[in-house]
Amino acid sequence: MARIAGVNIPDHKHAVISLTYVYGIGRTKAKQICSAAGVAESTKIGDLSEEQVDTIRNEVAKFTVEGDLRREVSMNIKRLMDLGCYRGLRHRRNLPVRGQRSKTNARTRKGPRKPIKR
């Protein structure tokens, strides 16, 4: 197994699919990385030479991925909460942030129903 950005990448899958195992890399970025590294998208990771894997590593290093990206996203949410803006309040109360209705639905974000105590 090749190790890219601290993640074990499966050898038996195509390069584009394998790169999506890294947090922050989807199909589009994986295709960009493969073309920049000069690797065919349908090539399996196990068939690549060590030099090709190194070029892929260097291309991935140009993006914000894994721990840095997770930290950045959590800091953005924390900043919204500290500002006290509407989106921050919605995050703080564990309610939908992007304008969805919350009177009847939003069970995923709110969690299981709480019984009414009489």
From Swiss-Prot:
Family matches, as PROSITE patterns: RIBOSOMAL_S13_1, RIBOSOMAL_S13_2
Recorded GO MF terms: rRNA binding; structural constituent of ribosome; tRNA binding
Gene Ontology cellular-component annotations: cytosol; small ribosomal subunit
Gene Ontology process terms (BP): translation
Region annotated Disordered, chain positions: 93-118
Sorted UniProt keywords: Ribonucleoprotein, Ribosomal protein, RNA-binding, rRNA-binding, tRNA-binding
InterPro entries: Rbsml_uS13_C, Ribosomal_uS13, Ribosomal_uS13-like_H2TH, Ribosomal_uS13_bac-type, Ribosomal_uS13_CS
Alphabetical list of SUPFAM superfamilies matching this protein: S13-like H2TH domain (SSF46946)
Pfam families: Ribosomal_S13
Keyword Iron: no
Subunit and partners: Part of the 30S ribosomal subunit. Forms a loose heterodimer with protein S19. Forms two bridges to the 50S subunit in the 70S ribosome.
PANTHER family reported for this sequence: 30S RIBOSOMAL PROTEIN S13/40S RIBOSOMAL PROTEIN S18, SMALL RIBOSOMAL SUBUNIT PROTEIN US13M
UniProt family annotation: Belongs to the universal ribosomal protein uS13 family.
Function: Located at the top of the head of the 30S subunit, it contacts several helices of the 16S rRNA. In the 70S ribosome it contacts the 23S rRNA (bridge B1a) and protein L5 of the 50S subunit (bridge B1b), connecting the 2 subunits; these bridges are implicated in subunit movement. Contacts the tRNAs in the A and P-sites.
UniProt protein name: Small ribosomal subunit protein uS13
Native source organism of the sequence: Saccharophagus degradans (strain 2-40 / ATCC 43961 / DSM 17024)
